Amino acid sequence: MIIEIDLMLIGMNKITTNNLNKRDYNNNNNSNNNNNRGYNNRKNDDNRYDNDNRNDNYRNYNNNNMNNNNNSNNINNNINNNINNNNINRDYNDNNRNDNNNNNNNNNNNNNSRDTVAPGRERERERDRDTSTDSFGLTYNSVNNNINSNNNNSNWDNRKMKIDWDQQTADSPLKRRKKEDEELENDKFNQQSFGHNQYKRNGSYNRTKSRSPSPPINRNNNINRNSSSGSGRVYATTSSPQRIDNRDSQSKYSPTYQQQITNEIRDTSSLLPINTNNKPQQQPQQQPQQQQQQQQQQQQQQQQQQQQQQQQQQQQQQQQQQQQQQQQQQQQYQNNNNNNNNNNNNNNNNNNNNNNNNNNVGSPASTNSVTSITPTLESTISKLENSSLNTPKIEPSATNTTNSNTNNQLTITTATTTTTTNEIIGDSPTVQNNNKTTTTTNNEEIIATPSKPKLQFGWGRGLASVEKKPEITNSTNETDTDAKVIMSSLTGGDSQSPSISTSTISLAPSSTQQETSSPLSSDTPLITNVPFNQNNNNNNNNNNNNNNNNNNNNNNNNNNNNNNNNNNNNNDSQSQSNNYNNNYNNNNNNNNYNNNLNNNNNNNNIPPLSLSNSPGLVNIQGNQNYQQQLQQQQQQLQQQQQQQQQQQQQQQQQQQQQQQQQQQFQQQQLQQQQFQQQQQQLQQQIEEPQYVCYPSYPTKEQVLFRIESIEIEMSNTESDITSINNSLTKMEQLLQKYKIKDEKLEQHNLQQLHQQKMEEKRVKQSKLQQQQQFSNQTQTPQSVEQSIYEENRDISKLTHSKIFFQNSLRAYDPTNNNINVGQKQNNIKKENIKKENIKKENGKDENDNNDNDNNNNNNNIEPLPTREKICTNITDFQCYNDNIQSHSLIRDNMKKLLKKRHKELLRYNKKQVKIFKASIDTFRKKLDKMEEEHNKQLEAKQQQQQQQQQQLQQQQQQQQPRQRKSGRPNLRSNAQTNNLISNGTGSTSSTSSTSSARNVLTRRGTITSDVARSDAEFNEIMDRLKEQDAQDPNCKYQQGVAIIPPMLSPEERNIHYINHNGFIVDPIAQEKQRKSLIIWTEDEKQKFVKKYLQYPKKFSKIASFFDNRTTEDMIVFYYNNKKTLNLKQLLFEAQSKKRGRKSNVFDPLNYIVTDKSGLNFMGEPSSITTNNNSTTIITTTTSLGSNSTTNSPVLAPKTGAKRGPKAKVVISTANLSRNNNQNNYDSNSTNNTNNNNNNNNNNNNNNNTTNNNDNNNNTTTTITSSSAPILGENNDLEITSSSPFLLATSNSVPTTPRLTTREQTIMATTASIHLSPKSPQLSSSSPSSSSQQQQPPPSSPLIGSLYIGDKEYNNKDKESENLRWTEHERELFNIAVQKHGTQFNLIADYVQSKTGAQCRSFYYNSKRKSRLDSSTSSSSSSSSLHHPTINSSSSSSFSKEKDKDKEK
């Protein structure tokens, strides 16, 4: 069975000793008893099973001590309430059971106290803050000494324990309920412990402030001794009253586990001394082996009880012969035994067998006599096993008075409300009453009163609870003294129990202690100090093994073994402690004995016990003394009833005192708070500077501070006012907006109403007009049918709308008064008008007229039919049969008309076919004629074009030497170049292309189609195609190839991911916003341009020169402004300046550009033209050491490691004549003309050209033509000077893409192909020669060599078979090298028998052989043109070549 047991505080008595620090096993040693559980668990885990007997005996010792005291008190209670009851023993046993359970709770309360049980080092730190030690080593709370102790008895309902009372019901539903309750309690405990830890982590943690007021510390200590040896070591602990209302949260373990801990106190040999820190120890849970042992013990108990019953029946026969006095004594003694048996039954978890030492004080020692168990004992045992009643919650009302055990003397004062054995170590005296306790600490008194106990029914928490008033009984001083005498006489100093059960309470209601002393008769000896020896104790134990242990043992161990262990353990004990224990037990048991005898006279159910062999009866002096004692006990019972009434009054007084104490405590708290506030104010005053001022005037600082505070307040108020004003303005604005909206809504509503009214009026007017029109019109069947048709049409239109309730369509029915309804109405109106006129003439009243008119109108006017007859089928119409008859008559006439019309149509169609055929024939004839004429024209044009092409080819062959094909293909075909350059060829090519297209389109004979005229042809074609496919290897391969399945399913293919990262809703607005934020000044723009030219497109480097710009800003600015600032052109110019310093010395671009149409090679108009007999002379000048540069982006040479001369382009014009005398002219005149032309070009075309005035540093080469050929009608030569390949302005950008130098030269020179000068002259002047020599150059070697055609390449390939170099070829090569430098293609053109690759290999091979490096350096000093020479005889060969040219 599972019984919920409340935790109870254990009051503690004082025993002063001197051996506080000794680690001995004496009863005089004082230490903390509540830590026995923790210390035993820490030190005795290894010796747990070896010392079971000693530990179990030690545990039961404490429990039995407590039980004895409770039994004595509860006997008195039962006697007072059940005097005439025959079943006293049954109630007595029930109460004893409850009391014993309460005693167990008392033991557990000390173990579950907050300061001693709660695990963890946090508890120790918390106690170290507020605890101190006495001179004896006792720990107590120095802060809470003066706090009310009533909280010890508060909220006991929340602290419950569970004990496995009967383990035979392990499979019952109650066991399951127990497990559920344990789980709930564990969860609650974990939550509370978590909250408690969080509470302790706070920085403002303080007991005195954060916690509720706690009562003063009851420095009462519990005793745990070894019952077998009597030499146990004493452990004293303080019962800390702090946080009593939540004890479950202060312990780490569940209640069931805590109960096991309390019941499993280990051997005292392994106990530790008092620790001021009170470190709690952890106890492991009980193992299942112990549970099995308990079950075995219970079975043995039942067997023993059966044996005891048999023995009792035998004893009853013997006891009937004895006297009534012996029977009463025996009855009293038997009741004590029953109490002790109940104690043992309730302490099943203790597993001990040593209750005999406490309870068998007056038992007989003979082996023949056996103690018996009464039926009442059996009933109590059965009730305990089968009861489902929880133990009542009895709260200790007070602690006990002090007992002194010094100099081997014992003084005992009995009490009624004590519950446990207690010891107190300390200096503070305690004054205790029946129902209240007063602890005097530091000259202050605080009184604690108990709370009402409750009796709870059921097994769970949620069941009903019934309050039960406590039954308090008190025994008089006389009964106490008589009990002392009787127990001392019964024991005779031979008591077997070495245990102690001290319980002292003063009966007086006052706060002072009243020691009770009763007059005893001279015949009754009072034993106060009886010396006992260890040998006597051992003998008694050995003699009583068989009798005592058979009644009371509940353990698995044998009785003899247990008692032998007790004897062995008693060897270490002291005689003084044994004497003390035995005396005290005798007195308590006597008290119980006497109380039960007085009120069990009428009980006939209890069999007597034979006490013939009892050693305690030897000291009784006659039956008279005993009868006197019984009388005294009856008197005491009467006095006790009176005392109960007094106690009730005292309780009321105590309650009032408690209320007063609470009020006082609250006042003290308020005083403390006030005192703290005063201290804080004093500290602030000390910290602030103090000045000596007059009391009436404030200090300057105070005034200034006050002024500042006022100003701050004013500023705050002003800010508040402004904020309020702003809010008010906003509210007003909102109100105005809402008003405007309301006005607009009202206007809108009014307008809608007005419109509705107007529409209603219009509808009415339209209806009236329709009625008038309908009345005026004469209706016919056609008009009625048309109106119905229109109405139905309008209704059918409305059917397309979503929400429309279609009306039924009207049907035409001439019989249903659809016709001439209006005429009838008009006739009725006319008649009414006539009647009115007649009535007026007769002078009748208007009212009567109106009434009559209305009646007539209602009677005469027939209303229009709202809904006509609806016909569902065609046959329902009346006109259906009429129409059939009429159509039968018309049918013959209609057939005749249709035949006539058909014949006429056939005739008309025949005429149209004839006309169409005749027109087609005429059209074909005309078309043939047109084609013949057109073909003739085309043939004539083709012949002309062919002639022109032949002429051009001949001219090209004459002008250009044969060339070998180069590796690079032409950029544009000959057709494109001819279209761009030739004067008349473009038109001819275009006409040829159009004529060919017309031939394809117009000639019918040349057109072929794939159309099959029949199925047979189609099948033949398909068969041929299949044969071809069968022979085709690709088709065979494709047939054998497997079709690759799609990698993705169609569903996955349709899946598209739309990425919205960086999505811009309105890019235009964002760009405007960005531009508005970023503003570039002109200085910044100029700075950017400079840095960009230094570090092109290195935006991070450029951004480092700006303070408030990033690389992103640089990039954005560049791409937005690169065209407006012309950054590419500027960058190219800057790079060309660097490259120009190391450029090629010789520039071979000396050519004449002419064109009839005045366009350059890109089709752009030229800006410079000349008259007849004038040409442009383009010369390239090189200057050494000059600073002038060209602005051409195309012809600028590439940069190199070294700086070289800079190239210049000079355009000179001169009038040319056909006379040979004018062919030669001086170089000075050319220089002058160059200067003039440069100035003109700078003004017109914005070209940056420089004038070269130094003859020493400049050399010019000019090509002149004596006669210019004439192509076309005009004789003018148009010269293009705006070509980007020749001269480029600073602002102009080339329109063509970037090309290589060779491609540019080819594109530029194709414009002058049609020119074929007969005798061009080459004049060269050097700075070293003083006289100018004029020598005729070869026949246009330069211009002819610039054009490359496909035909020349084919000829060169044939002539390139000869790889040997003749002397003539070498001479030509030397001349070409002097002119063209390292441009091997031009050299090959000049030599005409070698390719560019052959010239390149010949040049480097000869250079390697002759090591011409030195010769090139010497030649550079003599001439400004840097070109290599092959041998020293180059000048002679050059003169010979000139002579050959002249001869040609």
From Swiss-Prot:
Subcellular localization(s) per the UniProt record: Nucleus
Chief location of this protein within or outside the cell: nucleus
SUPFAM superfamilies: Homeodomain-like
Region of interest (Disordered), residue spans: 21-257, 271-291, 327-372, 384-409, 423-455, 488-620, 754-786, 812-864, 931-1008, 1180-1276, 1312-1347, 1407-1448
Pfam families hit by this protein: Myb_DNA-binding (PF00249)
Entry GO terms, CC: chromatin; nucleoplasm; protein-containing complex
Biological process annotations from GO: regulation of transcription by RNA polymerase II
Annotated ranges, domain SANT: 1075-1126, 1360-1411
Biased segments, Basic and acidic residues type: 42-57, 120-132, 828-847, 1439-1448
Composition skew (Polar residues), residue ranges: 189-207, 271-280, 361-372, 513-532, 606-620, 971-983
InterPro entries assigned to the protein according to its UniProt record, in alphabetical order: Homeodomain-like_sf, Myb_dom, N-CoR_corepressor, SANT/Myb, SANT_dom
SMART domains with a match to the protein in the record: SANT (SM00717)
Bias (Low complexity): 26-41, 58-90, 98-115, 141-155, 217-233, 281-291, 327-360, 399-409, 433-443, 495-512, 533-605, 766-783, 816-826, 852-861, 942-960, 984-996, 1180-1192, 1219-1262, 1315-1334, 1413-1438
Protein keywords: Nucleus, Repeat
Official protein name in the record: Myb-like protein P
Native organism taxonomy: Eukaryota, Amoebozoa, Evosea, Eumycetozoa, Dictyostelia
Gene: mybP
